[in-house]
From Swiss-Prot:
One GO cellular component term noted in the UniProt record for this chain: cytoplasm
Protein name: Ribosomal RNA large subunit methyltransferase H
Disulfide bonds: none
Originating organism: Listeria monocytogenes serotype 4b (strain CLIP80459)
Enzyme class: transferase
Catalyzed reaction equations: pseudouridine(1915) in 23S rRNA + S-adenosyl-L-methionine = N(3)-methylpseudouridine(1915) in 23S rRNA + S-adenosyl-L-homocysteine + H(+)
Principal subcellular localization: cytoplasm
Family membership: Belongs to the RNA methyltransferase RlmH family.
GO MF annotation list: rRNA (pseudouridine-N3-)-methyltransferase activity
InterPro entries: Alpha/beta_knot_MTases, RlmH-like, tRNA_m1G_MTases_N
Length: 159
């Protein structure tokens, strides 16, 4: 399986870089995983609704340019479906079983995802109703993808 994670902004925190690198190393036994960073749009702290939409649209265009046409796209969105780790694992396994070998996860910037990106996505998932920094979500996502492969194969890790 080829998994691509398209995300807005550069990862700055060393501890997150190290954690993600560790899970990418572990995942290499199961899938080819690549992370594609697109630049975030610089914006002032306080934005009008129109300005927020404009920022999301610009970031969204950058995201869409990185998604392969034949990819199954999963957007991480606060209004997405919440799943258990077992459900997430089963869903990833089904994608592989039904020939969806290219999966792209999308993590938006601090304002979220544009409507165009949400429309392009095949599904939306949420890791809960808490608001988490989008940089931290990268680590959470790669850990859950790793956990999913371990669950599907019945290997020890998931408790």
């Amino acid at each position: 399986m080829n998994i691509q994670i398209v995300t807005v902004g550069k990862l700055k925190e060393k501890y997150l870089v190290q954690g993600i690198a560790e899970y990418l190393k572990r995942l290499s036994a199961y899938a080819k995983v690549t992370i594609v960073e697109v630049p975030d749009e610089k914006a002032p702290e306080v934005l009008s609704d129109a300005e927020m939409k404009q920022v999301k649209d610009k970031e969204g265009a950058r995201i869409l340019a990185k998604i392969p046409d034949d990819a199954h796209v999963i957007a991480l969105a606060i209004d997405g479906k919440m799943k258990s780790s077992e459900e997430f694992a089963a869903d990833l396994d089904k994608l592989a079983t039904y020939g969806k070998s290219k999966v792209t996860f999308v993590i938006g910037g601090s304002l979220g995802l544009s409507e165009a990106v949400l429309k392009r996505s095949n599904e939306r998932i949420s890791f809960g109703r808490l608001t988490l920094p989008h940089q931290l979500m990268r680590l959470v996502l790669v850990e859950q993808v790793y956990r999913a492969f371990r669950i599907v194969r019945g290997e020890p890790y998931h408790k």
